[in-house]
Amino acid sequence: MKKIILFGLMALLMVACSSSDDGLEPSPVPPAPVPTPTDGTKTDSAKTDTAKTEPETVKFAAKYRVAKMTITTDGGQAVDSKDKKDYRACTIKIESDTAVWNYEGRGRIRGRGNSTWEWYDKKPYRIKLDEKASILGLCEEKDWVLLANFRDPTKLMNTLVFEMGDRLGIPYPNHTRWIELTLNGDYMGLYQLTEQVEQGKNRVNIDKKAGWLLSFDSDDGPELSPGADDNFWSQVYRMPVCVKSPEISEKIEVKSEKSLIGDAKKALGDLENIILSHDYEALKQVCNVPVMIDYLLIQEYIYNVEVAAPRSIFIHKDSGDDALWTFGPLWDFDAGFDFDWGHMYDGHGYFADYRETVLGTDPARHISNYDYVPSFFTDMWKDKTFVSEVKARWKQIRPRVTAEFWPEAKRYADAATEAMERDAKRWPIDKQYKTEINRMEKWLNARAVFMDNIVTNYPNGN
C-alpha cells in the first residue's frame, strides 16, 4: 500500500514544474533553506520542495538523465542566423524515459549567442514555442535556450554555477536538462536545455511594465550595439546597460522609448550613487545585500572575468516602493575557470592557474589581475560592515562549496557519460572530457583553499 501511495505522489510531482530541482541522491551537506526574498518579488512554492521524483531503484533521478530532442524545420530550412527576423518554423519532439516529460509541438528556432555563435561550428539555439509548455519538468513558458557548451570541455561550467545559485537562494535560477539534439536529420550532439533569462511568471517574476530587468553587457551596450534602442551608458560608473524588461513592445504602451530609457538610467543611477558613497545602511534600503554578496563571491570563486567587461551580468527590481535591486539571474560562465584567452577562437584550455583574481585581493583598490573591473562591483569593499558580511558569508558557505555544490554538478556528468562520448565523436576537440572534469574538480578544490586566504585577508574597510 505504501508503494502505491508513493508512486501516486511521484506521478503528481513529475508533472509539476520544478524550481528547487532537487535530485535523487542527498547532498553531503543539506541545502540551506531558501530565504524569503526581500525585494518584493514573488516565489513559486515549489522552490523549497525537496520531494524525490524517482524511485530509489533508478540510478539517476529524472533531472540528470539525457532526453532526445528532434527538431524539423518546415521545408528543411537551415538554421543559419541568430537574427530575430530569421526564426524558422519547426516541429519539436522530445523523448524522455520519464514518460510524462515527452513532448511534441510547434514552435520556431534561430541561432543565439555572441562569440559562441560567431566562432564555433557547434551552434547554440533559441527556441520559441507556439504555446507555453513545461519542458522536461521545468516551469511552463514559450522561450527556451539550447546551450552548445562547445568551448567548455567539461560541459559542466554553467551547470555548476546554476546549482550554486539555486542552492544559495539567488532568485530565479536557471536549471539544466540534458538533451541530444537532432536537427533536420543531423545529429548535433549534447546540449544543455535551460530557461531564457526574461521577465515572466515562471522566469524573472517582476512587473511586466513597471519592473526592471537589466544586463550589464558590452555586446548589447551602446558601444558594440550603437543602433539598438534599448541600451545606455550608466550615469555614475559608465557601464554598458541593456534593458531586457520592459521589452520594446511594452515600452510603446507605457511611455515613449526615450522617457523609459531615461527612467531606467535614473533608477540605476540612484543605486550607483549609493555604492559610490559605500554607505552600507543606505544600500540595504535599496538593494538585496545578501544576494549581492553571494553573487559576487560566486563570480570570484569561479574566476569569471566577464565581470570586468562586463558581460552577462543581470540585475532586476520589481515595482513598488519596497522593492529592492537584486543581482541575478546567474548566466554564462564558460569564460571563467581560468580560460586560456590566447586561444579564444579555437581553444578549450582551462584550469592552468587557480591563484588569479577578478575582483581582487583588495577589491576597493583594484589589486587584481583585472584592475579595470567596474568599481560598481568593488566600491562596497570600502565599507567595514560590508566586508565583515562578505567574510562571514564565505565562512558560512565554504563547507558546501566542495561537499555539496560540486558533487551535485558531477551527477549531471555521470548521468551523461554515453552522450558525452557521442558528442565528442561529433565535435572532436583536443581534450578528453573525463580528464577535464577531473582537472576541474582539482582546480575547484584548490581555488576554495585559495579563496579562504583571499577572503580572510580582505582589508577591513572604513
Residue ranges of predicted features:
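Sec-dependent bacterial lipoprotein signal peptides
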Residues: 1-15
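Bacterial Sec-dependent N-terminal signal peptides
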Residues: 14-54, 462
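Middle-to-C-terminal accessory/interaction subdomains
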Residues: 105, 116, 120, 244-309, ...
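Short, well-structured beta-strand/strand-turn elements
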Residues: 168-180, 304
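Internal "kinase-insert"/substrate-recognition segments embedded within catalytic cores
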Residues: 133-134, 148, 170-173, 186-298, ...
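Conserved NTP-binding catalytic cores of kinases and kinase-like/nucleotidyltransferase enzymes
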Residues: 54-156, 160
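Structural recognition of the beta-strand scaffold that forms the well-ordered cores
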Residues: 124-128, 143-148, 155, 163, ...
